[in-house]
Amino acid sequence: MVEAAERRMTLAEFLVWDDGTETRYELVGGVPRAMAPASGRHGLIQQNAANAIQDKIGRQGPCRIVHQAGLLLSIQGDDRFYVPDLAVTCRDVSDSPYIDEPKLVVEVISPSTGRLDKDNKVPDYCTLPSVDEVWLIDSRKPLVHVYQRVNGQWIGHVPLRPAQTFQSHFLGGEVPVDAFYDGIDFSPAPANPAAG
């Protein structure tokens, strides 16, 4: 992940701040953090996840998938603003820069974000009372981590691989891991003979 200048700011300042570029930022510990651009593989996995969710929630229901809108978190007085790859909310979607009451949060793990997503964002997302599930979908290898709130407690499942499914309590059905990786080839790229 590309780092922004270490300029501390409040959440209110961050929400109106413009650095004059097309760079997207998250706010962590009062410091804006630039988000690395997504790869083609990352984008395809994100779209596949959205399709898998849409198949379960339908197009006419009260819940909607929101792509790359912000989530506001306040943890021990520290305001944070994350931009997950996908979130599902059953509230009206407004012009606000953030999502109200997400039920499901999806992060696609990239080489530069894996540790932050798993070590920081997952525990932070789990503090939101509305969130029932968090999915981490790896773009580096076919591996999915699912976290679910069950009877008020968070349960993390063993890492899931292709040909496995998991029961999504929020979506009310099984989700195949293969659905996230449709069209993705993880075989090593052939060696470039011209690079010798």
Give residue spans per PLM region.
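Gly/Pro/Ser/Thr-rich low-complexity, intrinsically disordered segments predominantly at protein N-termini
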Residues: M1-G196
